[in-house]
C-alpha cells in the first residue's frame, strides 16, 4: 500500500467551544474565574461564527511514512512501534479563525490570547469529531 491517497472527511462545526478546555490553554488551573470565563464567552462568538472545520486523512504503511520523512523525531517512532500502518489526520478551522484571532488582539492583547486559546480548543474538538468519524468507518 505504501502511502494512501488523502481523503476528505466531512465534519460538522461544534455548536459551542469547550470553554473549560479553552481556559486551560489560556493558562487557567482548575475552574476559570468569572472574568476569564466572561472574556472567553465574549471571544468565542465571533470565532465560532467564522470557523469552517475541514479534515483530511490517509492510511499508510509506517515504513513508507518514515522513508518519506513524514515521521521526524524519535517519540513518534516509539508510539508507532509494532504498528504496520497508521492513519494520518489533518484538521483545520479555516483562515477565518486566524484572521479573527488577529482582529481580536488589535488593541486588546487579552482578547487575542483568549481567542487563540479558543481556537486551540475548537481545533481539538474538530479533531475529536474527525477521529469519531474514522472510528465509525472502521
What are these regions (language model features)?
Residues 1-115:
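Active-site helix-to-loop segments that bind/position phosphate- or nucleotide-bearing substrates
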Residues 138:
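Conserved small/polar residues in nucleotide/adenosyl-binding loops
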Amino acid at each position: 500500500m505504501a502511502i494512501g491517497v488523502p481523503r476528505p472527511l466531512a465534519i460538522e462545526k461544534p455548536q459551542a467551544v469547550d470553554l473549560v478546555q479553552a481556559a486551560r490553554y489560556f493558562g487557567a488551573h482548575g475552574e476559570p474565574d468569572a472574568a476569564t470565563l466572561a472574556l472567553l464567552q465574549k471571544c468565542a462568538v465571533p470565532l465560532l461564527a467564522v470557523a469552517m472545520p475541514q479534515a483530511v486523512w490517509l492510511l499508510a504503511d509506517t515504513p513508507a511514512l518514515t522513508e518519506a520523512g513524514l515521521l521526524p523525531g524519535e517519540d513518534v517512532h516509539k508510539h508507532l512501534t509494532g504498528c504496520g500502518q497508521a492513519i494520518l489526520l489533518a484538521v483545520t478551522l479555516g483562515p477565518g479563525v486566524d484572521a479573527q484571532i488577529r482582529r481580536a488582539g488589535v488593541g486588546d492583547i487579552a482578547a487575542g490570547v483568549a481567542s487563540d486559546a479558543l481556537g486551540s480548543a475548537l481545533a481539538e474538538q474538530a479533531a475529536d469529531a474527525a477521529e469519531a468519524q474514522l472510528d465509525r468507518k472502521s
